[in-house]
Amino acid sequence: MRLFAFLYCLAVAVFSTQLKPQKSKAESIAAGEEIHQDFCVQCHLSNGEGVSGVFPPLKASDYLFENINRSIAGIKYGLKGEITVNDEIYDGVMANQGLEEEEIADVMNYILNQWGNQSEEFITPQQVAAVPKSILGQ
């Protein structure tokens, strides 16, 4: 009987962590703003415009909207090598910041909906988890 009670409690503990309710898009964007301030603003700036030729813009970025999964992978794994954003070539390194999948989803939702950017897409931690490093071609 004790073994059954122990296994039951263990199962409840394990499954309760798996059943975490999903944030709303607004909650995700709000959380993403904090992450952007902590990890992204130093290079991409608070206005999302980046620095021409050095740090690509997030505001009105054709690369971001045309390559959402690749953008997720860049945050998740880091990014190096040439990319073209709004017809300008960038050839730098963006280090992996060690963010959790939920944090990556939140910051992507923030970026996709700031500075005039608008996206119907709602990035989830599950989508982030499914993005492989191989998509970067590095």
PLM segments and residue spans:
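Axial heme c-ligation environment in periplasmic c-type cytochrome domains
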Residues: 52-59, 80-135
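Conserved short-loop catalytic and cofactor-binding motifs
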Residues: 17-20, 46, 59, 95
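A contiguous binding-surface segment within folded domains or other stable secondary-structure elements
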Residues: 29, 37, 42-85
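Bacterial Sec-dependent N-terminal signal peptides
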Residues: 1-27
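Electrostatic cytochrome c docking/interface patches
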Residues: 17-36, 50, 54, 130
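The canonical Cys-X-X-Cys-His
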Residues: 32, 36-46, 94, 107, ...
